Amino acid sequence: MINVRVINKKRRIQKYKVSVKSGDTIKVISGKYKNIVAKVLRVLKYSNEIIVKGVNIKIKHIKPVRDNEMGSLKSLEFPINISKVVLLESRKKE
């Protein structure tokens, strides 16, 4: 999937309008993680994607920086398209 940036007449990159904010509870409606209910960790407005806790987890290999260190594996949540989710409960302002 290619992330397309929308450019307006003044040649500036526009943000997409999103109805989901970080901290909201959402439900994934399509894809590998269908019917999973989780919280939004981060919203990426320029690429129309969100990072959801426990969804789209991939393993990243980290190389050793120094000679005496060992490499490691780190599990990270990667973004999914916002069109694959539906808002269940929004975060309450306190």
UniProtKB/Swiss-Prot annotation:
GO terms assigned for molecular function: rRNA binding; structural constituent of ribosome
Similarity comment: Belongs to the universal ribosomal protein uL24 family.
Organism encoding this protein: Cyanidium caldarium (Red alga)
Cell compartment(s), UniProt: Plastid, Chloroplast
Example of a GO cellular component annotation carried by this entry: ribonucleoprotein complex
Major location category of this protein: plastid
Assembly description: Part of the 50S ribosomal subunit.
Disulfide topology: none
SMART domains given in the database record: KOW
Name by which UniProt lists this protein: Large ribosomal subunit protein uL24c
Function field: One of two assembly initiator proteins, it binds directly to the 5'-end of the 23S rRNA, where it nucleates assembly of the 50S subunit.
Keywords from the UniProt entry: Chloroplast, Plastid, Ribonucleoprotein, Ribosomal protein, RNA-binding, rRNA-binding
InterPro entries membership: KOW, Rib_uL2_dom2, Ribosomal_uL24, Ribosomal_uL24_CS, Ribosomal_uL24_KOW, Translation_prot_SH3-like_sf
GO terms under biological process: translation
Organism placement in taxonomy: Eukaryota, Rhodophyta, Bangiophyceae, Cyanidiales, Cyanidiaceae
Keyword Ribonucleoprotein in annotation: yes
